[in-house]
Curated annotation (Swiss-Prot):
It comes from Schizosaccharomyces pombe (strain 972 / ATCC 24843). One of its GO terms (molecular function) is nucleosome array spacer activity. Residues 92-108, 186-203 have a biased composition (Basic and acidic residues). The lineage of its organism: Eukaryota, Fungi, Dikarya, Ascomycota, Taphrinomycotina. PROSITE patterns: HELICASE_ATP_BIND_1, HELICASE_CTER. ATP binds at residues 439-446. A motif (DEGH box) lies at residues 543-546. CDD domains: DEXHc_SMARCAD1 (cd17998), SF2_C_SNF (cd18793). The gene is fft1. This is ATP-dependent helicase fft1.
Amino acid sequence: MKRKDNKELICIPSSSPPSTPIREENYYLLTSSPIECSPIQQLDLSGSFKNYSTTSSRANGKKFGQLAMQSRIFFDTTDHKKYVESSYAAYDPHDQPPERDVSLKESSNKINPSNFFDSEQITKINAVKKRFPALDSEMIIATLEKFNWRENITIHKLTFQKLLGRGNSTINKSAQKLNNQPIEKSSVDKENAKRKRYVEEGTKQGQKKKPLRVIELSDEETNEDDLLGQSPTACTTDANIDNSIPENSDKIEEVSIESSGPSEVEDEMSEYDVRVLNFLNESTLQEIVEVSGCESKVVEYFISKRPFPSLEKAEALCQRNAHAATGKRKKSDGRNVGRKLVNSTYEVLQGFDAVDSLIAKCERYGAMISNTMRSWHNLFDDKKMEQFLNTSTGSISYEYNSQQPSSIASGITLKSYQIVGLNWLCLMYKAKLSGILADEMGLGKTCQVISFLASLKEKGIQNRHLVVVPSSTLGNWLREFEKFCPSLRVESYSGTQSERINKRYYLMDTDFDVLVTTYQLASGSRDDRSFLRKQRFDISIFDEGHYLKNRMSERYKHLMNIPANFRLLITGTPLQNNLKELISLLAFMLPKVFDNNMQGLDIIYKIKTTSDGDIERAYLSQERISRAKTIMNPFILRRRKENVLSDLPPKIQHVEYCHMEETQLSLYLSVLELKNLVNANRENILMQLRKAALHQLLFRSQYNLETLSLMSKRILREDAYLDANPQYIFEDMEVMSDFELHKLADQYRHLHPFALKGKPWMDSAKVKKLCSLLKKSRPNERILIFSQFTQVLDILEYVLNTLDLEFLRLDGSTPVETRQQLIDDFHTNENYKVFLLSTKSGGFGINLTCANIVILFDCSFNPFDDMQAEDRAHRVGQTRPVHVYRLITKNTIEENIRRLANTKLTLESSLTTDSEKIQKEISGELMKSLQMDGRVDTMDGSVV
């Protein structure tokens, strides 16, 4: 646009700090190249302009950069000669005239940030520049300004753009512009809808209103600044000032708008702007609360005002009505509430897109694996094969081998499905990928892994391999190596600190094929971790791979630092229906694919769950969980017993209901009344109800305070308590159960008079049912008894001693070095009728096929824990039918737990091995049922 005098002007945005002087009589020369000089003498470290002088030196005139455009000065392109003469009049005539830069790129490279930014801002610029060296300085500065110099948010945004394939295109656009090359508009830009941005110019009291000056940019310039959805057509704050220079200097327009009210400026909504706006306009209350993390009251008010025509309208409503929504007074004006809702939603959506982008990288590898497995179709049924087929082209050259390795010990023959597993492992290794061997418990995963390592050695691959296992299975792995392939040279890395020091020196001078160690040592001390890293293993195998589900844990990070060419995870549990855990497993298996890209996923891990629900329940996450599982299929091999084992004996399930007697029932009802207390803790009440259904000795009802006072004084006569404080002892006794106090009295001579009379440990509904089952068992039958609680195992020891039955016990307190010996003793010595085990320690990774009866004394919240325990006996090598007995106390909370656990097993949306999550869900449902009716059925059918 031209003025009446035919002069063309370009006007620069003018929302500068209050200290910035405005000199409208000064004109700058504007050509197709950047401005040559600036009358601004210098810019202090705080970012404010100092008074300029026309007598400044030429050196100060060189202190010019892109940010000089932020000064509130007009440019007259027609009178530029007059301006040049006046601006150089005071310069030293002996100095050479300032050189003109011929390109924007050269000018931007000459910018010295120290002249325009303080030290903190310079540090942030360098941090972003180090992370994204391909971006030029002006792009980095503009992005930092957009996000108020928050470098973490800037890096996240740039990372997402890079992950989604937009970062490179943006950089290319910038490079094209710098070289004066034509720029093509992306398809996303063409599809973006126009939107209006309402901008308010804030003015302080007593401050003069400043004219708004707008630069009209060409399409090419709009594309260049479209990095993160930012539109450069209009901005009114320093953080959003456009720093680009119009290439067509003939089109210059002067616009003067007062800042007393909002102004409408045409802008384009970015891809994410449209998605966020649609999400906020269409999603439910719970979904917005889960994603944004805002309070329900704020979101309710927000929803009541929908739909919103723009994100700015949504932000403004939340900002202006935050107090009305919450009903609370705060020092701030509440503007951050609305900003948090929109920004949090924006970041979460980008986080999910980052997940999609990373998962997409796995599709190519999955296609190669599945296409190779087409030739194995005769080994799978059609339905199973469909899960592996992919329409993508490309495959891996691999010939299926139906023979087992010749180095496998004589007398051992791999089953057909194990041969398939061996070939799958070899295929993944040849493809330089990684995988998860997730066969159901008892199908011989250990045997398949050992055969895989033996096969590699026969092919001439003489490398070292690492096997990381839980402490309870270390001895079993060593025995399995010796049993299946004695030709493999296997070493164990375990023992005390001094023993491990000697072991490290020994291993440095020893040739071995496989090193077996535990999770505790592999992620423990610095010396152990350093030793394992220096070994440069070819293959790293991780038993019970679900231990690596948390990418943020120290264990995960330490194990990830152990270099390996191939990683294999072994697990017998189903994969978690949890986006974070699926991504963690993928990242651990394929670190090269995920390298330098995981930072963008941190937002997913920072999503806070609310009391109203869990982020994994939102549809946003569900569709990606489904896709992640589908893509992971080629990297996972999972078979079930009923599909591959025709000769495995059946597993027969029994549910034995136990009826409480009067004493136990009275105790249970008294605990049930606690739920009516105002300050009652939900989790504590549920635990107390479970204890009451198990055994009354788990409470303190027979030892009163007077008795405890006497016991605390008498115990001082014992040598172990000569110097003890009786008050402290009394306080400890107050929180002990009747059975713990009885054990204490039974242990120390001076407390014998306080021991319980008779055999009260036999007076429990479940104990009586257990005794009945033990008496019915045949002489040649061996029995495994599992319990969640070690104190229950203590009671069962007294029960078995009363029945005069020999038994063994293994729980979390059992030393690692003695666990395998206990298992061997149970296998070889038939005098041991019963093996007592804790569900957590004894339910994973051990082989107890010599037993054919499994008794679950109490059920776990997580049904998969119970299934693991059952399969200690029902696995390869079992020759007899396995009977599983679940003891359920009738008309108690145990029935509810069992019913809800069965529901979890049948619902695909709840296939998870996260015990804490399942316990939280079941606890909530149980408390709701208790609060609704507050009733309990007695043993005779009446209702209390």
